[in-house]
From Swiss-Prot:
Negatively regulates transcription of bacterial ribonucleotide reductase nrd genes and operons by binding to NrdR-boxes. GO terms for molecular function: ATP binding; DNA binding; zinc ion binding. Belongs to the NrdR family. PANTHER family: TRANSCRIPTIONAL REPRESSOR NRDR. This is Transcriptional repressor NrdR. It comes from Synechococcus sp. (strain RCC307). The gene is nrdR.
Length: 161
């Protein structure tokens, strides 16, 4: 592992422990050249998922890009970044379990909205407005009506169970 301070390639592991609920390993290292200490994370390499955009272009699924979009949508909603990171992990896990190499941006957005609807109605509408490219107030009204109906159905199902 290359030292971020001096770029020397030899380091020793001082400590290792499980991270991300056992999905990765956190290692504390020390450079053998300059004694700089740094942390690395190892995680299982999963199947690469390609997102097919509306324009037809393809790009590799990016956890950080999704998290950035969620953080922006959830500003001032009280949702903590830790919860959003878990949400991104849940979504990525769902994508991996589908065992499909491609997903459309529409399908990905719908998956995100399904999860966001349970966390924050405000974040749901904010995310939907960007992902759905709202063009006017009627788009907001349609989304709010759909969200209201979705939540009513969920409440009714919860009463039945």
């Amino acid at each position: 592992m290359q030292c971020p301070s001096c770029q020397h390639t030899d380091s020793r592991v001082l400590e290792s422990r499980a991270a991300d609920s056992g999905k990765s390993v956190r290692r504390r290292r020390e450079c053998l050249n300059c004694e700089f200490r740094f942390t690395t994370y190892e995680r299982v390499e999963t199947m690469t998922i390609t997102v097919v955009k509306r324009s037809g272009t393809r790009e590799t699924f990016s956890r950080s890009k999704l998290l950035t979009g969620l953080v922006r949508a959830c500003e001032k909603t009280g949702l903590e970044t830790n919860r959003l990171e878990l949400l991104v992990e849940e979504i990525e896990l769902q994508l991996q379990q589908r065992n499909q190499k491609e997903i459309t941006s529409q399908q990905l957005g719908d998956l995100v909205l399904e999860e966001l609807g349970d966390l924050s109605e405000v974040a749901y509408v904010r995310f939907a407005s960007v992902y759905g490219k709202f063009s006017g107030i009627s788009d907001f009204i349609t989304t709010l009506d759909a969200l209201r109906q979705r939540n009513q159905v969920k409440r009714q199902l919860a009463k039945i169970s």
